[in-house]
Amino acid sequence: MLLSIGMLMLSATQVYTILTVQLFAFLNLLPVEADILAYNFENASQTFDDLPARFGYRLPAEGLKGFLINSKPENACEPIVPPPVRDNSSGTFIVLIRRLDCNFDEKVLNAQRAGYKAAIVHNVDSDDLISMGSNDIEVLKKIDIPSVFIGESSANSLKDEFTYEKGGHIILVPEFSLPLEYYLIPFLIIVGICLILIVIFMITKFVQDRHRARRNRLRKDQLKKLPVHKFKKGDEYDVCAICLDEYEDGDKLRILPCSHAYHCKCVDPWLTKTKKTCPVCKQKVVPSQGDSDSDTDSSQEENEVSEHTPLLRPLASASTQSFGALSESRSHQNMTESSDYEEDDNDTDSSDAENEINEHSVVVQLQPNGERDYNIANTV
């Protein structure tokens, strides 16, 4: 699951980077505004800036080539004179219209009805370019030709050198720059998808890390099952391997299954917040099969009694095996020393064999509460 999300994240990032680079390179190479390429009878060219209208058809990708005709009347607020008829070919004619006196859509519609393939509206007493629009939906539905807007200086130059009567022709170059919504919306969609994938990836990784950390730590109920021993002088352990302080009487020690003991205040945070292993030998504190299985097995072993069961059997809890083994070894040592003493007594003083001899054998066994219980058995 994590691998598939990572691969998906990588592919989405690569696609996002490629599209971003190509998009910005494409936008930097394309012009911001459309142009009018004008050619006179000597084939000398000149370029004029224009601004396409917000209604009507767009210019074809290859541009629109035609002959420029002055509108009659110039404002085109009423039906205008149609273009001349050419004998050799139909030709394409573009009309030049003066601004003011009526709406832009009305001017362009009159040019369309007269038979022109495009309309150029020029400003009056200004070279500012205006974006032509319309509020009449009925008129907009009827307009099928493209139209552009130019400044007054450009219009005067076109009239002087590049009209049909002067032997010139023009080419309306389309606007190649994409509108903002054309590239901004896909860009935002790609960015949004990448952000969503990043959030999903981070959430998945966070959940997996939390689950892994929780699995490697010891729960509070598991910690309570580990035995606690109150230290006394003479015990086997003397120094805490975590804080390096010597044990003192009354210190509470946490005994791990590996027979290592630590201060409760030192080892408990390690087990519950870091790892459920011994800080020294790295042995697991809790078996991987689960506490329930270990508890069941220990209870079954405790209930099973046979002829091979030792008289001083260790406690069933695996966590107290270390102290149980220690107590059993000390008990065996005391019994051996007692028997040796009896043999020497019998060899040196045989006359006292008939007297009663109290033989004391001390059996030391560690009780579940962690304290030694001394039982004295009197044999006669």
Swiss-Prot record:
Membrane protein topology class: Single-pass type I membrane protein
Pathway(s): Protein modification; protein ubiquitination
UniProt keyword terms in alphabetical order: Endoplasmic reticulum, Endosome, Glycoprotein, Lysosome, Membrane, Metal-binding, Nucleus, Signal, Transferase, Transmembrane, Transmembrane helix, Ubl conjugation, Ubl conjugation pathway, Zinc, Zinc-finger
GO molecular function: JUN kinase binding; ubiquitin protein ligase activity; ubiquitin-protein transferase activity; zinc ion binding
Primary localization: endoplasmic reticulum
Catalyzed reactions: S-ubiquitinyl-[E2 ubiquitin-conjugating enzyme]-L-cysteine + [acceptor protein]-L-lysine = [E2 ubiquitin-conjugating enzyme]-L-cysteine + N(6)-ubiquitinyl-[acceptor protein]-L-lysine
Keyword hit for Flavoprotein: no
UniProt-annotated glycosylation sites, renumbered to this chain: N88
EC number: 2.3.2.27
Ranges for region Disordered: 285-380
Domain called PA: residue spans: 65-160
Transmembrane feature ranges: 183-203
Composition-biased stretches (Acidic residues): 292-304, 339-356
Signal peptide region: 1-34
GO cellular component terms, A-Z: cytoplasm; cytosol; endoplasmic reticulum; endoplasmic reticulum membrane; late endosome membrane; lysosomal membrane; nuclear inner membrane; nucleoplasm
Zinc finger (RING-type): 240-282
Any single GO BP term: positive regulation of JNK cascade
Superkingdom of the source species: Eukaryota
Keyword field contains Disulfide bond: no
Subcellular location: Endoplasmic reticulum membrane; Late endosome membrane; Lysosome membrane; Nucleus inner membrane
Role of this protein: E3 ubiquitin-protein ligase that regulates cell proliferation. Involved in apoptosis regulation. Mediates ER stress-induced activation of JNK signaling pathway and apoptosis by promoting ERN1 activation and splicing of XBP1 mRNA. Also involved in protein trafficking and localization.
Subunit structure: Interacts with ERN1.
Notes concerning its domains: The RING-type zinc finger domain is required for E3 ligase activity and for promoting ER stress-induced JNK activation and apoptosis.
The protein's name: E3 ubiquitin-protein ligase RNF13
UniProt organism field: Bos taurus
